[in-house]
Amino acid sequence: MHSATPTTPPSRPTAQAAPKTHTHHGLWADLKSPDFLALDRHRAIAVLPLGATEQHGPHLPLSVDSDLADCILSKALGLANGAANCPSVLALPLQPVGFSPEHARFPGTLSLSSKTL
């Protein structure tokens, strides 16, 4: 007597499952192109930090505003990393230029028009 072993019929192909998503907090430029496929685009925030390059007197570097923006951004990313159910937060490269026509007479100032910004 031959006993038949029950077999499961092969499954039919179904629609491809959506890729698993993950949360990432950090610098946009640190990701590889394929990493963006794993991000939930509906729960991702891109932050564009701006920091004017302008004089702050003879005793401070022109990068003060950019340095402050970078510090605030680092703190915000740290808070996002510690937060539950937080969307992905990706920081774009800091743009070290702003609208600074009042500083135009000082050497080293970088300024864009308000229309350009």
For each feature predicted by the language model, list its residue ranges.
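N-terminal catalytic or cofactor-binding beta/alpha core of small enzyme domains
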Residues: P6-L117
